Amino acid sequence: AALGAAAVIPACGGAAGDKSLSGLDRERFRSEVNGRPTGLYTLTNAAGMEVCITNFGGRIVSVMVPDRTGTLRDVVLGFDNIADYVRIPSDFGASIGRYANRIGHGRFVLDGDTVRLPVNNYGHCLHGGPDGWQYRVYEAHQPDPRSLALTLHSPDGDAGFPGAVTAKVVYRLTEDNAIDIAYEATADRPTVVNLTNHSYFNLSGDPTHPILDNLLTIAADGYTPVDSTFLTLGRIDSVGGTPFDFRRPKAIGAEIDSDDEQLRNGHGYDHNWVLATAGDLSRPAARLVSPVSGIALEVFTDEPGIQVYVGNFLDGTVRG
């Protein structure tokens, strides 16, 4: 993902003392979860951008990026301490595993055998179940100020999944304000693995300002519709003539209240778009722009689809 604004990016120094540019106190992230140490790790570049990550759940906690005036703004949702991440179940900024999104009815067939998993969302297994990797402590290694490698070992039978898996997530902040996230997983036997990042972006940089005016573009002619339990129906529908057509920039809120069955099923947008950019990293799969701040986010991926979720179940009672 690349973040930027239509402005000259000023050079900025590092955070003073033991606090990040976003105001995070590193001491509030120094703890233990299930006997494993947690911490806050900071990535910086010469352009003044800062990304803070905790190894609890491999989560992006804050992203400071300059707006059109050069003012640094935090554009992701996150808590300011490890205790809230542990106490309040959420996927804020998390590295999701062992399997992102839903496995229908908590079961799948592998090599002729039916594997059964815990269900935690409308009768399905969502994001690896109730004890997904977003609640685990990763081993952290920071070789330089611009990168962080996180490693997790998941034993055979973990949350019902077959095979022992070693997963590695590498975050890298580039000099042109891109956050590069690379995933790698190895298993000792056939299994399923599907990894992603679950950050919530508000490019206005103002948590009181809704995202509905953000302009979204998705390079996709089709999407996969879902039933009322958010499970895909096994087909690809055209976005043409529907609220799911973001082939040209459109405000997220422009049609979100339309009388549309798919919007009702998803309680808003919580769908997978079938990308026209599949396998092509030379052009963005999606682009989001805040008219308030001028900050733009471009997403590049070599995957065939992109899931867009606009926080339909965030009711404002949890603040990050």
What residues fall within each predicted segment?
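N-terminal export leaders
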Residues: A1-L3
